[in-house]
Design a protein with these regions (language model features):
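Extracytoplasmic/secreted envelope proteins and their assembly/folding machinery
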Residues: 39-42, 63-66, 95, 99-102
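Bacterial N-terminal signal peptides
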Residues: 6-15
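Structural micro-motif
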Residues: 69-78
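Non-catalytic, surface beta->alpha helical segment in thiol-disulfide oxidoreductase systems
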Residues: 81-106
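Thiol-based oxidoreductase modules, predominantly thioredoxin-like and allied folds used
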Residues: 26-27, 51-63
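Solvent-exposed loop/turn segments at secondary-structure junctions
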Residues: 29-33, 60-64, 72, 85, ...
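A short beta-strand-turn-helix
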Residues: 15-22, 63, 67
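Local sequence-structure signature of Cys/Sec-based thiol-disulfide redox active-site neighborhoods
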Residues: 20-50
């Protein structure tokens, strides 16, 4: 598992990262309690995410990501398939729902 914490991202960078295999993108914010919990889970549970390359994006520093991924709720996690299309999207966070979602979309 590779985790990237992106400070600045554009639509082009996002597309490039996805093409390079960054297949799980988590959009959140530091002021969002559920986002902080998810970020901590990602950092402390690499085994759960071993099938994914993870990119965590702060939507306050990268507001265009909100439009690009049609984010309505934080955090939002998005898995891309091999064709760089959205395979699955999860809005919100509870640990068990996130783990179940990851396992379903390996």
């Amino acid at each position: 598992m590779k985790i990237l914490f992106t400070i600045v991202v554009s639509a082009l960078l996002l597309s490039t990262n996805i093409c390079l295999g960054k297949d799980l993108i988590i959009a959140g914010a530091d002021w969002c309690p559920a986002c902080v919990k998810l970020k901590n889970f990602v950092k402390t549970n690499p085994k759960e995410l071993e099938n994914f390359d993870v990119q965590i994006i702060d939507i306050d520093k990268n507001p265009e990501i909100k439009k690009n991924l049609q984010i309505r709720l934080l955090p939002t996690s998005v898995i891309f398939n091999n064709d760089n299309k959205i395979q699955a999207k999860l809005e919100g966070y509870t640990q068990q729902n996130f783990i179940n979602w990851l396992n379903k979309n390996k």
